[in-house]
Amino acid sequence: GRQPIQRDKTINDNYYLLTLAAIAKEIRQRGLPPECSVRIAAGLPLTSFGRDKPKFKDYLLRSNQPVNYKFEGVEYSITIEEVAIFPQGYAALMTETGLLQDEPSMLLMDLGGWTVDLMRIDNAIPAADTAHSLELGMIRCVDDIREQVRRETGLSLTDAQIENMLAGQPCTVSDTVRDIVNKQGRKYTEHLLSATMEAGFDLHAIPAVLLGGGASVVSRHLSPKDGLCKTIFLLDDKVNAVGFERALAAVSRRKSEA
């Protein structure tokens, strides 16, 4: 099931344990021995990156090395050599370097579970003073749809049903229910665009790069009448992870050349 919303991941060990599980899976997938050294590349939201980076790095890079644990019947002994923290969303642009080269200014929109994090990028550099967060993430969108369907039909849909319909995937429901979900998806998109404009970002004037869980929803519910300058969607759910890996490789390369 979904982990409860936790704005500060360092308040308990949940995220740390998930990280150890992910390391074990990665080691197994790559055919590495269960006793090895690793480097972690992780991310934080644009709006809290500067504030939370030192604490989050310490949270992941603990003094009791190596870390010994058992996962799915296998004993692991992992030495975490390095932890590098990058801004979510911006790191994902490492996967699409042409975007940074072709546009002098763009708006980065990371549509997460609880928030939509916004930041302008000028000449390939994040403008940190423009960082803004809207509490319009996908959890709120799904909750609003569930309530609207219940109000109009008396039915109680699951998150999975709603998410499938928003993504245009199969789901056995009536046309009436599907219409409600699609109308709410469009309503959510309109609300998000309006809130973004109100936050001071002119979507008619600068291109927007959208990623995160909500990006596919917006991609299906945009309309030509919205009159947006240009929208680029990074819909691969691994785009941030790939970006972190490339960013870490670039940092390591610079260190070795220094």
Summary of predicted features, one role per range:
Residues 143, 147-150:
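Long, charge-rich alpha-helical interaction segments
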Residues 116-120:
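Short beta-strand scaffold segments in enzyme catalytic cores
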Residues 153-155:
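Short, basic interhelical loop/turn and adjoining N-cap
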Residues 112-113, 214:
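Short glycine-enriched loops at secondary-structure junctions
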Residues 108-110:
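Short hydrophobic beta-strand that contains or immediately precedes a catalytic carboxylate
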Residues 91, 113-114:
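Short, glycine/acidic-enriched loop or turn micro-motifs at the edges of active sites
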Residues 1-106, 125-139, 160-258:
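Nucleotide/phosphate-binding catalytic cleft detector across ATP-hydrolyzing
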